[in-house]
């Protein structure tokens, strides 16, 4: 599949490199997810051309598509680090957080537009180092520090963060064409209330100059999601097999892979739904919505199945 974006961290490469360094042993549970997160951060920050989100000089300050991609991918890295800190590496709700993951999660939440005192790149590279420290403890069988619990509830917690991100991005993409949206936040609950009054319906439309930014942010989001879902298939293999959820996960991955196809137009086309010119944002939204529906099904299966 042709793509103009960085290659995904390869799970086969991660496994083979670990085996080459450890006399053919299989990686421990959690190694694929941790290593994929580390490599994705390295790609975001140190890819060809570097990290552009915080550049303040031309021509890079005028190149907003790559910074939008970086924003989407970085948000997913933050979400995964949060899931690892709060859920996946803790045996129960009263257990202690892993200090390396605490530091990594905090460092990843530094402002991506800071270019000095401190620079965003410096903080993100430091976060990757904290993850390497956690990884070293994970593979050390003599250490009691650094664990990874591949349970169905932990996987569900990580997938829920992805589902919310997909839902938000899908709505933003759909707004490339003006549409009336009903206010449904308080629907189906007669006792609910909100802090602010809202009109029953609003017309939502992304400004023309921001359509490509939203599109490339979605590309970055799905790029990172694909990397992490493939890692989950390795580390949560027994959980997914027990729920017979591998086919569903494979279908989600197929939907998201479609979002990474190369664009053959020099600009993000933004036609109407059934007009002569295609609408790339609506096409992207369709794939992400289907992937999100699959994620919701797996989450329900993990919670209730």
Each predicted region: which residue ranges?
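Long, low-complexity intrinsically disordered regions
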Residues: 1-4, 68
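A cross-kingdom marker for long, charged
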Residues: 3, 7-17, 213-216, 222-305
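N-terminal Sec/ER secretory leader and immediately downstream segment
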Residues: 10-123
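Extracytoplasmic/periplasmic, Sec-exported soluble proteins
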Residues: 29, 62-76, 89-96, 100, ...
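Charged/polar positions within long, soluble alpha-helices
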Residues: 46, 50, 79-89, 113, ...
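A cross-kingdom feature marking solvent-exposed beta-strand/loop segments within repeated
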Residues: 54-65, 111, 118, 202-212, ...
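Long, amphipathic, charge-rich alpha-helical segments that form helical bundles/coiled-coils
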Residues: 100-138, 248-273
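Extended amphipathic alpha-helical interaction segments
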Residues: 123-253
């Amino acid at each position: 599949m042709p793509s103009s974006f960085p290659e995904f961290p390869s799970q086969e490469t991660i496994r083979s490199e670990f085996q080459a360094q450890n006399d053919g042993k299989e990686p421990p549970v959690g190694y694929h997810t941790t290593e994929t997160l580390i490599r994705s951060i390295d790609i975001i920050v140190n890819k060809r051309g570097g990290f552009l989100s915080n550049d303040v000089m031309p021509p890079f300050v005028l190149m907003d598509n790559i910074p939008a991609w970086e924003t989407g991918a970085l948000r997913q890295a933050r979400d995964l680090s949060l899931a690892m800190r709060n859920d996946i590496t803790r045996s129960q709700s009263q257990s202690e957080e892993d200090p390396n993951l605490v530091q990594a999660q905090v460092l990843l939440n530094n402002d991506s537009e800071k270019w000095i005192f401190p620079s965003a790149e410096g903080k993100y590279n430091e976060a990757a180092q904290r993850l390497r420290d956690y990884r070293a403890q994970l593979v050390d069988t003599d250490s009691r520090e650094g664990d990874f619990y591949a349970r169905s509830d932990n996987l569900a917690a990580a997938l829920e963060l992805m589902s919310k991100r997909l839902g938000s991005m899908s709505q933003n993409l759909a707004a490339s064409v003006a549409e009336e949206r009903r206010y449904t936040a308080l629907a189906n609950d007669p006792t609910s209330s909100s802090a602010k009054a809202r009109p029953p319906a609003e017309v939502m439309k992304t400004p023309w100059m921001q359509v490509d930014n939203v599109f490339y942010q979605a590309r970055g989001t799905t790029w990172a999601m694909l990397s992490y879902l493939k890692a989950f298939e390795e580390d949560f293999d027994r959980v997914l097999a027990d729920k017979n959820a591998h086919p569903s996960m494979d279908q989600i991955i197929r939907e998201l892979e479609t979002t990474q196809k190369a664009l053959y137009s020099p600009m993000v086309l933004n036609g109407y739904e059934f007009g002569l010119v295609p609408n790339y944002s609506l096409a992207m939204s369709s794939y992400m919505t289907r992937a999100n529906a699959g994620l919701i099904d797996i989450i329900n299966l993990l919670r209730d199945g």
